[in-house]
A protein has these predicted regions:
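Short active-site neighborhood of thiol/selenol oxidoreductases, capturing the structured segment around
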Residues: 22-36, 61
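Extracellular/periplasmic catalytic domains that process cell-envelope and extracellular macromolecules
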Residues: 20-21, 53-56, 101-105
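Thiol-based oxidoreductase modules, predominantly thioredoxin-like and allied folds used
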Residues: 6-9, 48-89
């Protein structure tokens, strides 16, 4: 068994195409260039061996700049960033897909089903043990059983993380 050193990041278009060949859920990291917590997640969470191995084995991983200029084809629509300014320092205009997915906090992790449908957004910084809960919850499909916020809180309370922080 060999360990890779990093997550195999794809573009969203690549992940959606890969799903047609081999269905897998998608984890999308919506970030920006200026976001401090996003950089911390790259350094502490996505570089964690337990996290990266679990993601590489079970998901298509997408890194998406919420203020970038990538052209995305999703739900039979084309999403772009018409007001994007190249080489701009700091904040840029918000990508149409970012708005469509209702992302208003960076970082936001969005999980998608094998069919490409959004499942859940998770807002803010997550350490390895915090993201583990969501990775396993989504991978196993346990979220289907939740009928309320209380159900999720119970799940969280009894969840025992195995990843090292």
């Amino acid at each position: 068994f060999s360990y890779t050193q990093s997550i195999k990041w794809l573009t969203f278009n690549e992940a959606l195409e890969a799903q047609k060949i081999k269905p897998k859920k998608i984890i999308m990291d919506v970030y920006t260039e200026w976001c401090g917590p996003c950089k911390m997640m790259d350094k502490n969470t996505f570089a964690n061996r337990d996290v990266l191995n679990y993601i590489n084995e079970n998901f298509y991983a997408v890194k998406f700049n919420g203020e970038g200029n990538e052209k995305i084809n999703f739900f039979d629509q084309e999403f772009t960033n018409p007001e994007f300014i190249d080489r701009r320092k700091g904040r840029n205009s918000t990508h149409q897909l970012t708005k469509f997915l209702q992302v208003d906090v960076y970082p936001t992790i969005i999980f998608f089903s094998e069919e490409g449908d959004p499942i859940i957004p998770v807002k803010g910084y997550l350490n390895p043990r915090e993201i583990e809960l969501y990775l396993k919850l989504i991978k196993k499909g346990d979220y289907f059983a939740f009928r309320s916020e209380d159900d999720f809180e119970k799940y969280k309370k009894y969840f025992r993380p195995k990843f090292r922080n």
